Amino acid sequence: MVKMLEEKAHSLVNRLPPWFKQEIPDAKKIQQMKSLFRSSRLYTVCESARCPNMGKCWGQGVATFMILGEICSRACRFCAVKAGRPMEVDPEEPYHVALAVKELNLRYVVITSVARDDLEDEGADQFVKTIQEIRLLMPRTKIEVLIPDFSNKIESLRKVTQAKPEVVSHNIETARRLSPYIRPQADYDRSLQVLENFKKLDPAIFTKSSVMLGLGETEEEVLQTMEDLLKAGCDILTIGQYLAPSNSKRHVRVKQFVSPQEFAFYKETGLNLGFKHVMSGPLVRSSFIAEEGYKECLQKIKL
């Protein structure tokens, strides 16, 4: 009986509120995108992380490429990406990503990856090669990289910095108190150090991070996380609603659904605190409409 009541409560809390409703996406465009990725042997975080915006983004011909395979060396409790023994590094992958960027004629592209603790540089070199290949084929395309923490290895961070992406993103994900439970193989302070070190290595690169709400955090904890990110030199912040990828024991359950009004409050607060750009809403994800954040940062430094 207790188990049945728990399952019922879980079902109720995971019943999506009305503000999650979206327009039906362009099915033909989505199929074209899927065919392109399959033929190029490429992965997208859109699919692997089961992003709720996939239909909208793919319908507009936009996607976030995920390099270094689709199996992560870590098993964060919020993430839908497969965890286990990572795949072999594909030396042709950077070129295939660049070809896809060219075929889609992207003005702005986001490159992310699984964590690769099994590699000496934890995947930094593959990021660099991917940036270089895109620069060769699409020199005007702006590039954002969404990186794992590379265990805060300075040499790995330096490699990526020297490749000159326009934006470097690393997600802190949640408040300090919840971090050990939500992402046990990561570390809250290490994530802050990664962002801070990127700024030290190249102050001209915009840095970015993301926070999920609905994991049991308090308003005070969200505001403290904002303060911590600002102290680390973070320019861009995205805030979205956590949605459990599955009902399995691996994944944390949703504790609460945050209203659009609360998201609006956090956006206003973040801008007042000093972030150059804040995108905050139930469906916001770290790579969602990423170009907008980059453009706003550019405008603000020109003022």
Predicted feature descriptions by range:
Residues 1-64, 95, 99, 105, ...:
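Auxiliary Fe-S-binding modules of radical SAM enzymes
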Residues 45-57, 68-83:
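Local cysteine-cluster metal-coordination motifs and their immediate loop/turn environment
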Residues 67-68, 145, 170, 280:
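Small/polar loops that bind or transfer phosphate-bearing groups
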Residues 75, 119, 178, 247, ...:
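Glycine/Thr-rich phosphate-binding loops of Rossmann-like dinucleotide-binding domains
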Residues 80-96, 103-154, 160-194, 208, ...:
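Core AdoMet radical
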